[in-house]
Amino acid sequence: MKDLLKFLKSQTKNEDFDAIKISLASPDMIRSWSFGEVKKPETINYRTFKPERDGLFCARIFGPVKDYECLCGKYKRLKHRGVICEKCGVEVTQSKVRRERMGHIELSSPTAHIWFLKSLPSRIGLLLDMPLRDIERVLYFESYVVIETGMTNLEKRQILTEEQYLDSLEEFGDEFHATMGAEAIQFLLKDINLVQECNVLRIELNETNSETKRKKLTKRIKLLESFIQSHNKPEWMILNVLPVLPPDLRPLVPLDGGRFATSDLNDLYRRVINRNNRLKRLLDLAAPDIIVRNEKRMLQEAVDALLDNGRRGRAITGSNKRPLKSLADMIKGKQGRFRQNLLGKRVDYSGRSVITVGPYLHLHQCGLPKKMALELFKPFIYGKLEVRGLATTIKAAKKMVEREEAIVWDILDEVIREHPVLLNRAPTLHRLGIQAFEPVLIEGKAIQLHPLVCAAYNADFDGDQMAVHVPLTLESQLEARALMMSTNNILSPANGEPIIVPSQDVVLGLYYMTREKINGKGEGMLLNGSNEAEKVYRLGIAELHSLVKVRIIEYKKNEDKSFTAIKKIIPTTIGRAILWMIIPKGLPFSIVNQTLGKKDISKMLNTCYRILGLKSTVFFADQIMYTGFAYAARSGASVGIDDMVIPEKKANIINEAEIEVAEIQEQFQSGLVTAGERYNKVIDIWAAANERVAKAMMQNLSTESVINKKGYKQKQISFNSIFMMADSGARGSAAQIRQLAGMRGLMAKPDGSIIETPITANFREGLNVLQYFISTHGARKGLADTALKTANSGYLTRRLVDVAQDLVVTQDDCRTHEGILMTPLIEGGDVKEPLRERVLGRVTAENIIIPNTKNILIKRNTLLNEKWCDLLEHNSIDNVKVRSVVNCDTDFGVCAYCYGRDLARGNLVNKGEAIGVIAAQSIGEPGTQLTMRTFHIGGAASRAAAESSIQVKNQGIINLNNAKFVINSAGKTVITSRNVELNIIDNFGRTKESYKVPYGAIMAKGDGEKVHSGETVAKWDPHTMPVITEVNGLVRFVDMIDGQSITRQADELTGLSSIVILDTAERMSSGKDLRPALKIIDCNGNDVLISGTDMPAQYFLPGKAIVQLDDGVQISSGDTLARVPQESGGTKDITGGLPRVADLFEARRPKELAILAEISGIISFGKETKGKRRLVITPVDGSDSYEEMIPKWRQLNVFEGERVDRGDVISDGPESPHDILRLRGVQAVTRYIVNEVQEVYRLQGVKINDKHIEVIIRQMLRKATVVKSRDSDFLEGEQVEFSHIKISNRMLDKKKKMPATFSRDLLGITKASLATESFISAASFQETTRVLTESAVAGKRDELRGLKENVIVGRLIPAGTGYAYHKERLNRRQKKHNNPTVSSSQISAEEASASLSELLNSALIEK
């Protein structure tokens, strides 16, 4: 057996495996792993320090302590390899076998495995169908359980207390059998006939109707089936044999001073062995039952503590009062095996140092200190020295390097040439946090970094440190050069815009260089080309900013990549002409003929990349940087105290504000305004004053008046240093300048409320003590916020990466016709994001037709690049259906067409690109820039809430979407449908503005009419909701009895009387069943029918409705019958920033969410209960109606008798994404989440491409619930991977069988990560114990599809360059399968993977 095992173990080393299976280990399997039984609790001998025989470190069981040397020293050296010493019984072999050889302990009494007992839901409990409490009482020897009933009235699995047991013994004698402890449970588990039980339960499931019972049965059936399929036996959840971890994985290390440091596991094992031996002795002595029982209970507790300390009862503590670390603690958590050693490892050949600026470097270079390079590249240097024959041995080479001989430096230069190194700055938030550079040797001890890559690293030079890594193999060097070189990462993968963008000094230099100055020296000169411009500037004949005319040559790039020269004479400035020298051929002069700010420079680089490609852009970026630095130095811009000019008007403005505040205070004291109003008004006054001061200050700073050539005064933009820095985008902002030279303004208290006394001083004047104290609040809160934000943002990124890590581009085209309809994002009168930006880089899902014709403009499956987008704009197309990851039909992964352009490269995405991780990084990386706070609505926000009209901004044509309306007696259009959209469309058919119009709004202009800008097109009363009639006739009151269902009120001011409907709660008992309504009848007293239906026009009135009509009056369609007052929903705080993004991705249901109509039909109300009313929707086609209970305090948007469509809003509130998915489908929920997430990022000015969010949504929609299983193998109500249902249904379709029906589920990212197919990935994310328990019972197989699983098992990931490797591997396996030539000495892959799964199963694979 031993030899066979050795053979097996040597095989698993090199055997290539495809999947990993985890299952329960049988006692025989545990014994087969073992090399001997551990019988004694001793570890090592205190005198000789040699392991004790049969102890926890026994050399005979686990192998020799020293390489090739037995314990007694009889056999030493390699020549005795494989000999077993007859004296000490130790095999002569390498000592590293002590890391892999296991032992075992034969338990004298079975013990339950705590994971299967206590990890909820308890597997043992579910199998036996007994409550966990009862099982625990049996296991810990408090009660008996009946095993054999015999001819008694006891039931099997019945729990008996000590008394009941003794009574039954007296009554029935030996007829029945009841015991306690793990033996009893083991017996019961053995007794289960899985298949038979399963069939019984299935029959029961079909017969029951109770929902809870069905759920419980389904759970049991699933568990039983998983046991049947995985060939696990239930009794294996009870241990008879305990495996012992190899000793080198729980080491005992001698410390100085004769003490030992030991792993906690040794203590835990010692307790188990001690108790086990004692129990053995007691059983041999046939000790009294009560003593044996106690000992068995203690053994059970010791085993529990070893497996998972602290899961049951108090954790066992060591000598220093801290809980001992059990086996379960070894693998879970941040310090556990998964996250500490398998997903992240320490790296050899690396160093770290402080970074400084390298302004003279090229973009692909970094400065590496000589000392560091020498250390990092040592092996290469040794090798070179030996090859050259300069050193005879490695030892000699080592000496030479240590002495730092001159020749060593020459060789270092050679070694380093074209050998890229990787630079990494922590935290690595996205893939640009590690880039490759070619090292340049420098003196000093700091790494030099190229300034343009700082943005990608988020680095600055205030003491940041960076790590250097050396790629050793040729392949890794190739990857570093081809994929990770900084010159290949010009565009950001998050939004496809350049990330190599100059900032700060460079921007200031270029801004200064391209500014104009009126009447500068040399104005009006005519110059021939840039060289002459530079000459006159250098000679001092002309100033940098003077306006001159220059003759330049522009080059236009043709289709065939050649250039056409165009000569022009252009009015410009000297500086711009000089800058033109570095602009690459193919860009127009207009690009520099403007004052360049940061945005313009970014645009310039982007244009360059799109027109001229990567190489030119890299060269251009370097030139921009050198020029910018040079001219920033020439500009001599600096910050002096006199640059901060305080406006003269400031004192007046503040005085006026103080007078206004005093007035309000008087009004408050005389009781004209409330405290709240006073506070709000005071804050508004100061906010306005602050704005005025800021405006005056900016006017002052930004312009200066100069004398022009003709001798007149003229205003020009100022050359004030502080203004230039802010205006160019180099540093600072108007808000900061305002605090320097204006006034600091209002400050907030720590709880977010605003302090009403503002700081009127600015930093130039200086703050007094009180003002300084007030401003410390904000500063401190900012620091605390930042710390919290970093942690939260990091956790969000981790969850996102985990949910999306296995999403890789796996095929070119999945051929789906599905897609998302993209429209420009319009809110109110503003286009927030034009269509062009939303579809750029996507693939069209269907042909795009030129409007009003049948001609195809763009074919299906075209990647929309900049040129196509220009075409779209030219033809004024305002909606495009594009392919999306959410609709992709690929089973595992996505296809390239559904993803579209790889944003970091600008072409169609390649196969093997890990788009999931890229998406997660793009969303998580800006997380630290988002705010943490929830916004409190006050001041401005509450005023905007009560909108009552729509005023358009652009002229155009009105277009009403899904609108129903009637014309009232005044000839105006009245809206009678919900969720109406009003769009303003320009002459080209493009939507310019979009508004929501409420029910009952009166339109000034109708559908299709022209409007001018500033015109008001719709009005409504924001405080009441009208009930509008759609027919003409006479009003008839129904059930409106004074004092019972209505009361009459007279208005004090007008004297008009009105009728108010009483709420049911306020009515007397006699009026409870009355249902007040207004009926419309014709002059003969017959009911008027609503047009197009056979329903009488009857309008039921809700409580609190106000009617201002009399019985029998004539009314016409569009008139208001009654008004229902709308309570203004009190101010709610909106969650913003990071928490909002987390809520959306976790798919949390909001509080007080909107109620949506589940089906289409007619609304009516059924019988009410105390706090709820019953809403009934009856479909028009006569199918089953739908009922829902709604709390009475909810405001409803619908009246009785109204028609709603599925998914319409019945009661307002934040919508739940789950409802949107269920009622409106995948498209709608995608649109909702994308827009909501983008809203948060847009507020912070962060650009993220929509497709990244869609990638995460695809992963959230991974699961589906089976509605009807039909001919498939699924259970009804079971949650299954969507891809499995798709594959299964395809198979059933082929066989002409009935496929399963299903509904898609939306899971939050945490849930989705834990519900993934791969148990390795789930276990390494969170809740390790639960995941492993579940997987072991079900005998799960991990196909190793994702990236994480492959990293953990130590393989290349199936993405990027590893994608090809895995493909090749699969092909090889296919070939092997097709023509198997297995010799008898080989073992099959199945056996090998089985033995591997056994190793893994006991959580023992260390590396």
Curated annotation (Swiss-Prot):
Signal peptide: none annotated. Zn(2+) 2 binds at residues 814, 888, 895, 898. The keyword Cell membrane does not apply. InterPro entries: DNA-dir_RpoC_beta_prime, DNA-dir_RpoC_beta_prime_bact, RNA_pol_asu, RNA_pol_N, RNA_pol_Rpb1_1, RNA_pol_Rpb1_3, RNA_pol_Rpb1_3_sf, RNA_pol_Rpb1_4. Its cofactor is Mg(2+); Zn(2+). Its EC number is 2.7.7.6. One of its GO terms (molecular function) is zinc ion binding. GO terms for cellular component: DNA-directed RNA polymerase complex. Zn(2+) 1 binds at residues 70, 72, 85, 88. GO terms for biological process: DNA-templated transcription. Pfam families: RNA_pol_Rpb1_1 (PF04997), RNA_pol_Rpb1_2 (PF00623), RNA_pol_Rpb1_3 (PF04983), RNA_pol_Rpb1_4 (PF05000), RNA_pol_Rpb1_5 (PF04998). Keywords: DNA-directed RNA polymerase, Magnesium, Metal-binding, Nucleotidyltransferase, Transcription, Transferase, Zinc. The keyword Magnesium applies. Mg(2+) binds at residues 460, 462, 464. Binds 1 Mg(2+) ion per subunit. It catalyses: RNA(n) + a ribonucleoside 5'-triphosphate = RNA(n+1) + diphosphate. Belongs to the RNA polymerase beta' chain family. The RNAP catalytic core consists of 2 alpha, 1 beta, 1 beta' and 1 omega subunit. When a sigma factor is associated with the core the holoenzyme is formed, which can initiate transcription. HAMAP family: RNApol_bact_RpoC. PANTHER family: DNA-DIRECTED RNA POLYMERASE, DNA-DIRECTED RNA POLYMERASE SUBUNIT BETA. DNA-dependent RNA polymerase catalyzes the transcription of DNA into RNA using the four ribonucleoside triphosphates as substrates. This is DNA-directed RNA polymerase subunit beta'. It comes from Buchnera aphidicola subsp. Acyrthosiphon pisum (strain APS) (Acyrthosiphon pisum symbiotic bacterium).
